[in-house]
Amino acid sequence: MFKNILIVGCGLIGSSILRASIKKKISKKIYVLEKSKIHIKQIKKLRLNCEILKDPKKQITNVDMIIICTHLSEYLKIFKKIEKYINKNTIVTDVGSAKEKVSGEIKTKIKRNISWISSHPIAGSEVSGPEFGNEKLFSGKWCVLIKDKNVNKKHLKILTKFWTKIGSNIVYMSLKEHDHIFSITSHIPHLVAYNMVKTAMNFEKNKKSNIVKFSAGGLRDFTRTAASNEIMWK
């Protein structure tokens, strides 16, 4: 399907995309750009069939698709590092859970005409890191693709095929529709969970009482949600 794919950031989602792409033989060559020494060590230990780029200055030619799997605040920095890999045929996508602000910044601050089509696979876990990656993470799960009036239709079709091939069910949304839906179904529940667990822990500390120890199913569900990596929201 592809000759070269570059995955930027290889945590839970990035490593799951990597594993699924290897399993489905999506690309002849898969590159991973990762700055975490711990993650690099884990990827090597897992013996995943990819080339790790420790140095973003290394030249790669004919990159068909770049998938950004980092937290949102890193996007503009990443674009400066990967810009040399992008040509007119390169699809650039991401897996972030907030779209309108980030996409707006990319369009206004990145001067080059790039084929940017944002993705949001509705899959994940409270755990993080490449060792928790799962080639079946996206199987039967929704993946939202942002479809605006300027989208490259050929690239959208290719990106749809990619996500479908690794198991996702595709739905198309506008930036506004996406952010409206997931602010209610995902962001607010996480915010409530973080505050609920923090309140319980503070109360336990102040009262010197084992509150969390005796939590029933309700609070346990909150703790699972609150355990997810908060840096991905920044």
What are the roles of these predicted feature ranges?
Residues 1-58:
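NAD(P)+-binding Rossmann beta1-loop-alpha1 motif at the extreme N-terminus of oxidoreductases
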Residues 35-36, 70-71, 95:
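Short beta->alpha hinge that forms the Motif I/post-I loop of the SAM-binding pocket
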Residues 58-86, 90-91:
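Rossmann-like NAD(P)-binding element
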Residues 78-131:
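Rossmann-like NAD(P)(H) cofactor-binding subdomain of soluble oxidoreductases
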Residues 31-33, 53, 93, 117, ...:
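Hydrophobic/aromatic beta-strand patches that form the interior of the parallel beta-sheet core
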